[in-house]
């Protein structure tokens, strides 16, 4: 693995391919591909390559937290020839009804889990199903440990995995030891077939409500599946959770990058020498308080009006004092 920093990019990270030797031909067909990944809110992302757009679990928030200027618009969708909207399951935080209004403006293909309510528009997929959506887009559905499915999309040779609600859902405050063991077994069984795939980019939950072991599922997924790049999601607005996970969990096989700001983007370039060049397309935001004393260090405020309150926790680890679920409304 190699890390380099250049100007004007904020970050320039090269990730050496961890593909097995017998798959060297598959690596060569992926070279010189460029992706743009955009984070919206919670588990919502888009992945764009040339004139193809993938949208996963788009949600504008319970109270419409996603700012208007960061939302997907019909004007944006019209810039693509192929648009695919993936809905992993029917939980409100993974499905915003607005996605079904887009089809009145542009042609859209919806891919939804087979257990969605009757009448839901889209191509239904159950675990084990596979679809060819176009010459450049193929998709497989895998199991989840909650409702619905997880998706693996092959986009012109680049494999993108979105977990949906696949995770090790242990609730240590509420569950018995037996229930936790059953959840662990179910999660391991769900991950097993995914581990047979070669994954370039994975979006995976790190849910702050689970307490100290909030990252148990993500770490196990990284250990077994070894995606080249993992982006945490489903952190319920707790940006510090995602960034701390990225800081602690990156390893030789997998780079971890946290996208935490509405509309934050990264660019991926799959190079001829088997690396992924990762660059930030939205520069870091540092807001300096107007009240600061010029003789003092700048006061950095949290962007997007999201407060980070670590009172009662060790500054280096927000879960150091408890392995019980953290209630977000406290």
What residues fall within each predicted segment?
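Zn-dependent metallo-beta-lactamase
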Residues: 1-53, 60-62
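Active-site environment of divalent metal-dependent phosphoester hydrolases
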Residues: 42, 62-63, 90-95, 117-120, ...
């Amino acid at each position: 693995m190699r890390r380099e920093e250049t100007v004007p990019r904020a970050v320039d990270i090269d990730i050496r391919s961890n593909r097995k030797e017998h798959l060297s031909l598959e690596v060569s067909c992926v070279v010189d591909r460029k992706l743009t990944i955009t984070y919206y809110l919670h588990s919502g992302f888009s992945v764009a390559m040339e004139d193809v757009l993938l949208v996963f679990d788009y949600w504008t928030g319970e109270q419409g937290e996603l700012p208007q200027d960061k939302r997907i618009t019909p004007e944006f969708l019209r810039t693509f020839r192929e648009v695919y909207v993936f809905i992993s399951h029917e939980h409100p935080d993974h499905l915003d009804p607005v996605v079904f209004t887009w089809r009145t403006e542009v042609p859209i293909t919806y891919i939804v889990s087979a257990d969605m309510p009757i009448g839901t528009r889209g191509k239904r997929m159950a675990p084990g199903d596979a679809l060819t959506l176009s010459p450049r887009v193929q998709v497989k559905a895998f199991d989840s440990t909650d409702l619905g499915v997880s998706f693996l999309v092959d986009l012109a040779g680049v494999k993108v995995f979105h977990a949906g609600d696949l995770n090790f859902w242990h609730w240590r405050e509420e569950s018995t030891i037996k229930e936790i063991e059953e959840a662990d077994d179910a999660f391991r069984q769900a991950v097993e077939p995914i581990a047979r795939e070669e994954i370039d980019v994975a979006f995976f939950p790190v849910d702050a409500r689970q307490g100290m072991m909030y990252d148990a599922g993500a770490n196990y997924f990284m250990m077994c599946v070894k995606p080249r790049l993992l982006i945490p999601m489903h952190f319920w607005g707790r940006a510090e959770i995602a960034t701390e996970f990225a800081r602690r969990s990156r390893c030789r096989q997998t780079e971890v990058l946290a996208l935490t700001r509405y509309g934050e983007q990264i660019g991926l370039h799959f190079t001829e020498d088997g690396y992924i060049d990762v660059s930030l397309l939205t520069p870091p935001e540092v807001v300096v308080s107007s009240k600061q004393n010029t003789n003092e260090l700048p006061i950095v405020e949290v962007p997007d009006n999201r407060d980070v309150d670590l009172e009662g926790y060790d500054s280096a680890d927000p879960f150091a004092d408890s392995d019980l679920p953290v209630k977000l409304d406290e």
